[in-house]
Amino acid sequence: MVDKDTERDIEMKRQLRRLRELHLYSTWKKYQEAMKTSLGVPQCERDEGSLGKPLCPPEILSETLPGSVKKRVCFPSEDHLEEFIAEHLPEASNQSLLTVAHADAGTQTNGDLEDLEEHGPGQTVSEEATEVHTMEGDPDTLAEFLIRDVLQELSSYNGEEEDPEEVKTSLGVPQRGDLEDLEEHVPGQTVSEEATGVHMMQVDPATLAKSDLEDLEEHVPEQTVSEEATGVHMMQVDPATLAKQLEDSTITGSHQQMSASPSSAPAEEATEKTKVEEEVKTRKPKKKTRKPSKKSRWNVLKCWDIFNIF
């Protein structure tokens, strides 16, 4: 004999399998309806196609029990299905199955968009569809949000809290006081220039050129306009003055040569004398060689003849 508890468990598993089949069938029907609407099938043809077909799938025979008794389960309506679920399933699974069985795709999408609109107020329809919201906010507020996120990440890693002001200085976020000081030093800058820290100075080109020409005129006086523009100054000199300067330079040069020659002559003579004396001292005396005269040769021959006689 089969125990009642085991039989109840088997029946419970069978009913759960049946519910799963019903859920898959309802999902398939919704998919067919969505495909027909996307293909442009009229509503009358969709209604005609659904006539004559059962609302539930064909009855599926359950597995045979050990007592060789075949049981089938049939739910004529959704009310009976809900009653069965309420009786045999826990509350949590009951709610989850009901929400899955009766959920609508359009309702789910609308709920997601409502949640998105709650998180990002003031967003447009395109922003809702793309899930991207362009925030229009104060840069200081945005910087505070970013610093807060950085602090949260650091605290999650290290487990310690850090001062927001220190994080601002470490990240290089400009303070409002710094921007005010910048505006004081560089007046007339725009908001974008304050944010970027770059100030484009507006200077009149005529004023700038005039100041440069004044500086050039100070360095080289009596300069014409063309000479100021080209940077070349043609000096105007009197020819008589130039010739006089050349004559003076030649006269001074000749005087220098004449004054240098008498003083240099004794020094040159002294050096030559010392050189001659050194050569005389270092010179070696030559040996004198006498050449025999003719008479001496004749006397030698006579003596030789006398020697031969003896």
UniProtKB/Swiss-Prot annotation:
Residues 283-297 have a biased composition (Basic residues). Residues 39-58, 108-136, 156-184, 250-297 are annotated as: Disordered. Residues 270-282 have a biased composition (Basic and acidic residues). Pfam families: FAM153. Belongs to the FAM153 family. Residues 259-268 have a biased composition (Low complexity). InterPro entries: FAM153 (IPR023249). This is Protein FAM153A.
